Amino acid sequence: CTSEPYQAPGTKRMAQRLAQLVDGINPEENIYLSAHRVAWLRKRPPAKSAVLKLSQQIELAKELLQAGESAAAADLFQTVRGQAGANRLRTRPSLEEMLALSYLRLGEQKNCLDNHNLASCLLPIEAAGVHKDQAGSRSAIHFYSEVLRKSPFDLTSRWLLNIAYMTLGEYPHKVPEQWLIPPAAFAADYEIGRFTDRAPDLGLDALGLAGGSIMEDFDNDGLQDIIASSWGLSDPLRYFHNQGDGRFAEYTSKAGLTGIVGGLNVNQADYDNDGFVDVLVLRGGWFGADGLHPNSLLRNQGDGTFADITEESGLLSLHPTQTAAWADYDNDGHLDLFIGNESSPQQNHPCELFRNNGDGTFTDIAAATGLDVIGFIKGVAWGDIDNDRLPDLYISRLGEANLLFHNDGPGPNGQWHFTDIT
C-alpha cells in the first residue's frame, strides 16, 4: 500500500475551514455560484401564473448557461420561446439573443474544450481553429441574423455573428455585407507575429476559472516552476514542477497542498528570508457578503512541501480580497504585507497592513499607520516615489478615486505613518 503524502497540521486545518465554506454556500444570495444556483432553482416550487412560470424557466435557463450547461440552456430557451408569444412575454436580452449565445457557447465547448488544439479560440480564428462540430455556430448564426433583422444597430450581436462565421471558416466571404466587420478591423498597427500556446505540450493545459499564477523556482534547482489558483470554491491550487526536460509534472499532492482550494489571485515572496520563496493565496474577491474567506500563507519548507501557516503567523482574517503586495516598508530587513480588501455599502472591510515581526508572525498595524482604507480595492503596488528609500503605496479602487500614500517614516514616538497625498 502507499501512504498519503505528508500534510502539515496548519494545512489540514485550512483545508477543513475551506471545505466548511463550500458547505455553507447560500446560492440564493451568491450570484456567482451558478452550478449551485441551478440546483437551488430546480427545487423551487413553480409559480401559479403562466407568466411567472415562464419567468422562472428563463431564470433557470440563464443560470444553466452561466454554469456551462449550454445545451440544456438552449433547449429550455427554445421551450420558453414557444410559449412566450402566447403570453406576451418580452425579455431583455431577448430570447433570440440568449439562444444565439447558448449555441455559440455550445460550439465553443464542443470544439475549443472537448477537441482543443493550439489554434482553438485564438482571434482571428483560422485553419486548425475552425470548428469541426459546426452545429452550435450554425444555430448561433441563425438566431443572431434574426436579432439583427429586428435590431440592425445591435453591435454586440453583429460582432458575435462575425465570430460565429469565423469559427466555421466562412469569414469574411459568407458574412452578409450589411453585417460584415471587415478584416481590416482586425489589423494591428504593428505586426508582432503569432504566439503559440505551448501549454498542452508542457503538461500545463489545466482547466479553471479566473485565478492567479506565479512562475518561480520554488525548490532552488535552477528551473522555474508554476503555481496556479482558480476562483471556484472547490477548485484546487495546483503546483506544476519543472522537470527540466521541457515538461511540467503536477506536484500538488506531493507538496502537501491537497485541500487548499479557491483563490482569485496568488503572489510570492520569501517572507522569512530562508532562501525559499513562499506563496500567498488571496480569496473572497467579488463575492461580497459571501466573501468572508481566509487567505492562505503557504510557507515553503525547503523540502518540496508547503505548510499553511496562516493562523499561527497572525494573518488569519475574513475579508473579500484579490490583491496584496509585499514590501519592507520600515527597512528592518523583513518583508511586510499590505492587503487591499473589498468594502461595499453594506459591509466595511478595511485594508490591512501586516508588519513582519521577524519571528514568523505578523501584526496588523493598518489603523495606526493610516492605511485602514475603505473601498472596493482592486489593485495595490509599492514604490519609492521620492527616492527617500521608503516604499510608498498606490491603491486602485473600483468606482472611486485611486489613492497615493506617502511613507512618512517613524514619528517622534517611533510609530510609522502614511499620508494620503493623492
Language-model region placement:
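N-terminal leader/linker segments that initiate helical-solenoid repeat arrays
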Residues: 1-55, 59, 113, 177-179
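Short coil/linker segments at helix-helix boundaries
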Residues: 24, 79-93, 101-146, 170-191
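Structural register within alpha-helical repeat arrays
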Residues: 53, 60, 99, 106, ...
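Blade-edge motifs of beta-propeller repeat domains
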Residues: 173-208, 241-261, 298-319, 354-375, ...
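Beta-propeller blade termini
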Residues: 202, 211-220, 241, 255, ...
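Hydrophobic beta-strand segments that make up the repeating blades of beta-propeller
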Residues: 213, 225-230, 275, 279-283, ...
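Short glycine/acidic-enriched loop and turn motifs that connect beta-strands
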Residues: 232-234, 285-288, 343-346, 400
